[in-house]
A protein has these predicted regions:
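Active-site loop/oxyanion-hole signature of alpha/beta-hydrolase fold enzymes
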Residues: 1-38, 199-206
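Conserved catalytic-core motifs of eukaryotic protein kinase domains, centered on the activation segment
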Residues: 7-13, 72-75, 167-168
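Short beta-strand/loop motif that positions the catalytic acidic residue
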Residues: 150, 156-158, 162
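Conserved hydrolase catalytic core segment
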Residues: 29-72
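Conserved alpha/beta-hydrolase catalytic His-Asp/Glu region
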Residues: 70-77, 89-149
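Alpha/beta-hydrolase active-site loop signature
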Residues: 1-5, 68, 189-192
Length: 215
């Protein structure tokens, strides 16, 4: 994503729709006409935009630990405070405050190494880039009205113990899609791909089979 990893530090603000365009452009650049796409958390917001803006690029869609709705006023205000915090205090302080929200308490207690790896990844990002990503999420569009335009096979996967995205929000996403299954995993938090990789992989495999991409 823009601003993360080895990408350049963004100068101008950008939107979730811009990141969806980036993803479509990447597929074009590496000569992949269409793909099964999984979007985790922020990636799910990007995937929803990609399905509307570049529908021919997506053959199947997996929404993982994510939702269709926009930020509430309270959540948007909290993001502004977090943006200021990460700029003032740095990425390490942000990671220390953020990472505990990502995992279920039981998993975090039993797997400190995995939690530590997540902390290292987040704390290694640039504060300005984190703030810009938070701002893009704060201003993202409510995609609920567009869900009935999506015809590709879809699946919603998440943890019932997710502290950031409610089970209700994930069910609302699934119900708005015409061809979509849902798997909510017990005793799993936001990091469903880390806490329950086998179950997530199974659902992705099932999605690929439904889309005729996997035998």
């Amino acid at each position: 994503l823009r601003g993360l990893g080895k990408t350049e530090d963004p100068i101008q603000p950008f939107s979730v729709a811009d990141m969806a365009d980036d993803a479509a452009a990447l597929l074009e650049a590496i000569d992949i006409p269409a793909a099964a796409v999984a979007g985790f958390s922020l990636g799910g917001y990007i995937l929803a935009q990609m399905l509307i803006r570049h529908p021919l690029k997506v053959r199947a869609a997996a929404f993982v630990s994510t939702q269709a709705g926009a930020d509430t006023a309270e959540r948007a205000e909290a993001r502004v405070k977090t943006m200021r915090y990460v700029i003032d205090e740095g990425a390490k302080a942000f990671a220390e405050a953020f990472v505990p929200q990502l995992f279920s308490p039981t998993y975090a207690a039993a797997h400190p190494d995995e939690v530590g790896q997540t902390y290292e990844v987040i704390s290694g990002q640039r504060p300005n880039s984190i703030a810009m990503l938070l701002d893009a999420m704060r201003q993202r569009e409510d995609m609920t009205p567009y869900l009935d335009k999506i015809n590709q096979p879809c699946v919603v996967i998440g943890g019932e113990g997710d502290a950031l995205v409610s089970s209700l929000a994930m069910r609302n996403l699934q119900e708005g899609l015409s061809d979509c299954k849902i798997e909510l995993i017990e005793r799993v938090g936001h990091m469903s791909t880390v806490e329950a990789p086998d179950k997530v992989s199974f659902e992705l495999d099932q999605l690929m089979q439904r889309a005729g991409m996997w035998m």
